[in-house]
Every structure is written in structure tokens, then in C-alpha cells.
Amino acid sequence: MGTDQLVRQAELLVGQVAHWTPARWRGRSDGVHALVQRLADAAAEAEGRTAYAVPRLADTVLPDQIRVMVADLVAAEHRPDVLDRLADDIRATRSAL
């Protein structure tokens, strides 16, 4: 599964939140930003570089940050078990929203 499942879960999450207004994000954005940070950390690990803090931009930018982090993970060809774990993480975040 790996890549396909990760991309699918990311698409579902982005589809769920991309249209949200700033008011709708209130109280929900911290969990999604934390997910973006975990995705960024995994991408850094896969690329063999130091992890960095993902900038905290406007909440409405979070869907784009998810897209970028998932694209980085796919390009880095991370291990399938890690991608499956991250797909589960995205699924759990979706459920929590």
C-alpha cells in the first residue's frame, strides 16, 4: 500500500478542510498543524536531512502544506511501513476533526 494509501488519505483530508473559513478552523488548526509537522519530520528523515519547524502560516494554508509534505514524502520514497503509519496518522486526524 504505502504511497497510494498516503496520497489517498491526504486527498481525503484536503478535500474535507480546503474550503474551511478561518472561523471554521478555530479550535481545529493545531491538530492539523501538528500533523503537518509530523509529515515534515518524516520527510526530513527519508531525505537524510535535519528536521525543521514548519512555519505557522494562516490556517487556510494548511491544506497546501499537507500537499507539499505528502509530495516530499512520495518523492523521497520512504519505507512502505512508515508511509502506512503516516496514512493512519492522517486518517486519525481526519476523524478528530
Sequence positions of predicted segments:
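Amphipathic alpha-helical binding modules
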Residues: 64-97
